[in-house]
């Protein structure tokens, strides 16, 4: 809910509109979204360009990472509208269709990132815990592209109702763009919002934790293969586990906890406006964490992929050497 509202609360019903003091959104969301745009846009473009340049040697993890970067790029391209909106004191001048599209992109990126990170983690789990099994190697990159197609279809199906519930409205003689739904639809939105959290976050999160618990047990076993190659493999898997867990903890967990609490409170009859405002502020205050995911994902890519991490350094060395030769 993205607005300072009027002051109507029917007895025995959830508060439909309350006066919110939300100056913090202009002070918090505008600079955070600006940083995500300025940093995340070029980073994700670089990730996409590097993966496409290496398309002949793509691994399945790289295919998932490419789709992850595409989701982040689409979201970053929608940020200028939100930055303008919050910089003008939460006034939305772009129309109802743009409002619905921007809200859809946010949640599509959010849940797409969760699912693609889960795919990357599961791929890592198979390589560590079932390295000799052939059943998961069939199909190669083609199978990975099929999985990505299924993920995109699932994300679209999950998040499409967001574009239905999101809408513009008039508050205090200005047009606003509701994030979840107009206040009058709060009880109708609740089942969908809870289902989206369970299916789009909780279940993938549990699957990811299960994968990494199994991987940790396997990597800590003393009877595993020895040698520098095996040690590097263990180290790489450990880095991936720590970084992905950090991404989930920073980007997704606070947002979904506060969102779930806010959805429950705003649909509860008899809740006072000050209480609702407190939960709304907590929810909206964690939204930047979810947006920063578009910056953390490409950093995760460079942190865990040594081959791609060397490419910018090698390119810089070649350009420097060429520039020095031209000076001679």
UniProtKB/Swiss-Prot annotation:
GO terms for molecular function: G protein-coupled ADP receptor activity; G protein-coupled UDP receptor activity; G protein-coupled UTP receptor activity; pyrimidine nucleotide binding. Belongs to the G-protein coupled receptor 1 family. Receptor for extracellular UTP > ADP = 2-methylthio-ATP > ADP-beta-S > ATP = ATP-gamma-S. The activity of this receptor is mediated by G proteins which activate a phosphatidylinositol-calcium second messenger system. Functionally coupled to phospholipase C. It comes from Mus musculus (Mouse). It comes from the Eukaryota. The gene is P2ry6. InterPro entries: GPCR_Rhodpsn, GPCR_Rhodpsn_7TM, P2Y6_rcpt. This is P2Y purinoceptor 6. It is a multi-pass membrane protein.
């Amino acid at each position: 809910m993205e607005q300072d509202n009027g002051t109507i609360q029917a007895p025995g019903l959830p508060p439909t509109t309350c006066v919110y003091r939300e100056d913090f959104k202009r002070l918090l969301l505008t600079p955070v979204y600006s940083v995500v745009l300025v940093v995340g846009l070029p980073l994700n473009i670089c990730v996409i360009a590097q993966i496409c340049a290496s398309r002949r040697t793509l691994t399945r993890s790289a295919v998932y990472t490419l789709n992850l970067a595409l989701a982040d790029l689409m979201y970053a391209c929608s940020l200028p509208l939100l930055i303008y909106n919050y910089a003008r004191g939460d006034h939305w001048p772009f129309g109802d269709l743009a409002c619905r599209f921007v809200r859809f992109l946010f949640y599509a990126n959010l849940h797409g990132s969760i699912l693609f990170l889960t795919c990357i983690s599961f791929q890592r789990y198979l390589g560590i815990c079932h390295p000799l099994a052939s059943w998961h190697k069939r199909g190669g990159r083609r199978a990975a592209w099929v999985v990505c197609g299924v993920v995109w279809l699932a994300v679209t199906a999950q998040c499409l109702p967001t574009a239905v519930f999101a809408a513009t409205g008039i508050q205090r003689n200005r047009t606003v763009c509701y994030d979840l739904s107009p206040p009058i639809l709060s009880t109708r939105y609740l089942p969908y919002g809870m289902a989206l959290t369970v299916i789009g976050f909780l279940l993938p999160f549990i699957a990811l934790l299960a994968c990494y618990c199994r991987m940790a047990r396997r990597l800590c076993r003393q009877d595993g293969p020895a040698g520098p190659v095996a040690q590097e493999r263990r180290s790489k898997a450990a880095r991936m586990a720590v970084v992905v867990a950090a991404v989930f903890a920073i980007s997704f967990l606070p947002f979904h906890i506060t969102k779930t609490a806010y959805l429950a409170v705003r649909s509860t009859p008899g809740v006072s406006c000050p209480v609702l405002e407190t939960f709304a502020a907590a929810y909206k205050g964690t939204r930047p964490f979810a947006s920063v995911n578009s910056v953390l994902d490409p950093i995760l890519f460079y942190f865990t992929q040594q081959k791609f991490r060397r490419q910018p350094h090698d390119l810089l060395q070649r350009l420097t050497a060429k520039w020095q030769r031209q000076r001679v």
